[in-house]
C-alpha cells in the first residue's frame, strides 16, 4: 500500500479543504430560488398575521399587543434573597 505512510491528519485536512472549495463554488452559482418571501407587517400591527384577506379583519379589531396587562395582586415587595 502506497498510502501507508500518509497520515490521517493530512488526508482529513485535504478532505476538509476540498469540501470548503466545493462549498464556495456552489455558493457562487446564481440561483433563482431565493427561498420563501418574508413580508414585514405594517407598523403598529404588533406581529399580527397578514395575508391578502386579513386586512379587513385587522382593521376591525385591535392588534394583540394593545390588550391591557393583568395586574399582579401578589405582594412582591419582600425578597427571599439575603
From Swiss-Prot:
Coiled coil: none annotated. Its main location: membrane. A motif (SxS motif essential for MIK2 binding) lies at residues 43-45. Interacts with MIK2 (via extracellular leucine-rich repeat domain); this interaction triggers the formation of complex between MIK2 and the BAK1/SERK3 and SERK4 coreceptors, and subsequent BAK1 activation by phosphorylation. It comes from Arabidopsis thaliana. Belongs to the serine rich endogenous peptide (SCOOP) phytocytokine family. GO terms for cellular component: apoplast; endoplasmic reticulum; Golgi apparatus; plasma membrane. A motif (SCOOP motif) lies at residues 43-55. The lineage of its organism: Eukaryota, Viridiplantae, Streptophyta, Embryophyta, Tracheophyta. It is found in: Cell membrane; Secreted, Extracellular space, Apoplast; Endoplasmic reticulum; Golgi apparatus. Residues 28-42 form a propeptide. Keywords: Apoplast, Cell membrane, Cleavage on pair of basic residues, Endoplasmic reticulum, Golgi apparatus, Membrane, Plant defense, Secreted, Signal. One of its GO terms (biological process) is response to bacterium. It comes from the Eukaryota. The keyword Plastid does not apply. Residues 61-82 are annotated as: Disordered. Residues 1-27 form the signal peptide. This is Secreted transmembrane peptide 9. GO terms for molecular function: LRR domain binding; receptor serine/threonine kinase binding. Residues 68-82 have a biased composition (Basic and acidic residues). Mostly expressed in stems and siliques, and, to a lower extent, in roots, leaves, seeds and flowers. Mainly observed in young and mature trichomes, hydathodes, the shoot apical meristem (SAM), leaf primordia, hypocotyls, stomatal guard cells and emerging lateral roots. The keyword Lipid metabolism does not apply. Induction: Induced by pathogenic bacteria Pseudomonas syringae pv. tomato (Pst) DC3000, jasmonate (MeJA), ethylene (ET) and salicylic acid (SA), mainly in shoots. Induced by increased levels of photorespiratory hydrogen peroxide H(2)O(2). Up-regulated by heat stress. Strongly induced by the necrotrophic fungus Botrytis cinerea, both in locally and systemically infected leaves. Brassicaceae-specific phytocytokine (plant endogenous peptide released into the apoplast) perceived by MIK2 in a BAK1/SERK3 and SERK4 coreceptors-dependent manner, that modulates various physiological and antimicrobial processes including growth prevention and reactive oxygen species (ROS) response regulation. Inhibits the fungal growth of Alternaria brassicicola, Sclerotinia sclerotiorum, Fusarium graminearum, yeast (Saccharomyces) and Botrytis cinerea, thus being an antimicrobial peptide (AMP). Prevents global growth and development.
